[in-house]
Amino acid sequence: MGNYYSCGASSTSSPTSPSLVDYYYCYHRYPSSCSSTSTATSSGGRMPIRSHQQRLSSPTAVLGHETPALREVYTVGRKLGQGQFGTTYLCTQVSTGAEYACKSIAKRKLLSPEDVEDVRREIQIMHHLAGHGSVVTIQGAYEDNLYVHIVMELCEGGELFDRIVERGYFSERKAAEITRVIVGVVEACHSLGVMHRDLKPENFLLKESSSSSSLKAIDFGLSVFFKPGQVFSDVVGSPYYVAPEVLCKHYGPEADVWTAGVIVYILLSGVPPFWAETQQGIFDAVLRGSLDFDSDPWPTISDSAKDLIRRMLRSPPRERLTAHQVLCHPWVCDDGVAPDRPLAPAVLSRLKQFSAMNRLKKMALRVIARNLSEEELAGLKEMFKAMDTDASGAITFDELKEGLRRYGSNLREAEIRDLMDAADVDKSGTIDYDEFIAATVHLNKLEREEHLLAAFAYFDRDGSGYITVDELEHACRDHNMADVGIDDIIREVDQDNDGRIDYGEFVAMMKKGAIDIIGNGRLTIGRPTTATSDDPSPTISSSSR
């Protein structure tokens, strides 16, 4: 829903959206490549506005569940920005004093059910991408009778776009570092079944004002979940950055790579590759796809950089580099930071992380996952449904193997079998929904204090403050884990050797690192997280920003 600070409007269905113009020239000039059909969900008929607004007056109309009042959790401070849908404020968490940005969206501005769905999906996608070091972190969402409030990480360093304007263009070294961040976000989105659809320099903010500050991707208001092979037709995005297949209403995630290629061109030259005095003139230039590498500063730019841009801006999309291939391009990885092997999808890294956990931790994660909100789980729910091809409610080995292949994995069969065994906590031979969610949801959701307290209380049935052998045996029976060595679990977690597990020992077990994915997509093993951190995800090092 618009910019991080401005709360601008960008509904995929709004008839007044500036992106939805007459693309007659596309059909006249490119009839073989343009299509008006789509597998994307149709908006269908609209309900009367008055009836729609009456429904929105409920404090659960958008999120679908009750939330605490925003001002019970945060104090709201100065205004940071304002746009068509609402206002962004500085807010301070009452319990910790930590500062965040709060985007308050006026429900009266949501004129259709499609607008409501856009807000709901934006929140779901932000939760789904949580933990990536270059994606702004959502802290929570709140709803009352008048507003939906999205509380997120505060980024005070300004827009990447402003940095481009200030400098005209970046050095190639700096541009390559920024490219790694931007395309790393694209790769992470695609591996999690998300298409961004509105990448642009304005949607990347600097965390702080320092020159070495990290970049954070914001604004997922136009982003959508996609399945491999799915085709979309709604024309969205920003004129300078939109891919030709989007104008032709027949596109997939490859469009994000085109958009990233446009950003790389701007980083190196200070001007967009497709420019005209009018919006339709811009679209015409996009469809022609002619690149200017003759004007300044291009004669001084390396051939490697120009090769990358050409390959990112190829049409048709099937000839374009994937996000992973961009990260492996020599211009991007000249300093050795870019990955030297295919990136496993982020979900795959989480499965590997899960496989290193003991059985008590796996049970605890299942307990926590069951209590996560719908918007936190929506993305993983879609991935589960995509893998569960026979809709049986459980993923078989063959379904897991095929699903991982479609999401970009090239694991050997033995490795997939290991992941299957790790996720199949009850040893039924399949992965049910609870097991899938527990194995793939990012740990920053699972390590929050309220979740840990609830999970500990689940095991500590008598409220004594300790998990005993009897209570652990009871929990194992509930989870169909009859073969678990109770004594071994107690011995592993019980740090003071009193034969039981207190809350501190339980938290230490839950926060102990196993395998994590770092900003450039590579896996590190045995990397512990600190007990005081709310977000166990690592940050991108200065060499990879």
From Swiss-Prot:
Feature: compositional bias, Low complexity: 34-43, 528-545
GO MF annotation terms: ATP binding; calcium ion binding; calcium-dependent protein serine/threonine kinase activity; calcium/calmodulin-dependent protein kinase activity; calmodulin binding; protein serine kinase activity
Catalytic residues (positions): 198 (proton acceptor)
Keyword Membrane: yes
Residues with lipid group (N-myristoyl glycine): 2
Keyword annotations from UniProtKB, A to Z: ATP-binding, Calcium, Kinase, Lipoprotein, Membrane, Metal-binding, Myristate, Nucleotide-binding, Repeat, Serine/threonine-protein kinase, Transferase
Domain EF-hand, first and last residues per copy: 375-410, 411-446, 447-482, 486-516
Binding, Ca(2+) 2: 424, 426, 428, 430, 435
GO biological process, one term: intracellular signal transduction
EC identifiers of the protein: 2.7.11.1
Binding-site residues, Ca(2+) 4: 494, 496, 498, 500, 505
Activity regulation (UniProt): Activated by calcium. Autophosphorylation may play an important role in the regulation of the kinase activity.
Ligand binding (ATP): 80-88, 103
Subcellular location: Membrane
PANTHER family membership: SERINE/THREONINE-PROTEIN KINASE
Name listed for the protein in its UniProt record: Calcium-dependent protein kinase 6
Protein's gene: CPK6
